[in-house]
Amino acid sequence: MRADRRASEALDQHRREADEQGWSVVEVGGGGRRALPFAHTVGLDRSGHPELLLSGRGRPEAEVLLGSLADEVLAGRRFHVGDVLRSGPWPPLLLLRVSAPEALVAAQAMRGSDEPVAALQVVWADDAERWPWDPAWVTSAQEQQLFARAPKVAEPRTFT
């Protein structure tokens, strides 16, 4: 009962933030032996844009990165599957369609509909600009869980 109340209060807080600024970032604990913590936006769905999900980055970095991308969406930018973003202090970022939208529990609850919420995963490259599905990808203390399928062709569109 106490956990349900905390979850409800947290959802209300994210709803207020989304009402005020158009989005909020929700952090989700790993919750399983192999699951890693991740973060996702709530509120972008209201503007007709998929929510954004990021795994493998710490809380402050996830909030800054997702918040920056969310602000771009609210300013009129639209992100698409296959876009590669190269800006700011981050490594190249590839956007993929989330194939497990049930992971975005808060976004689904805010949507208030049984229709799965659409989302894009912000996948980050390693220092050599390789993606996690590349056998040469260098893992470090930071690993990312994929909520999307790796592309069959590694020829994404690049945007700055």
State where each predicted segment sits.
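A short, structured beta-strand/loop element
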Residues: 38-42
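Acidic, proline/glycine-rich low-complexity IDRs
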Residues: 1-33, 44-47, 56-160
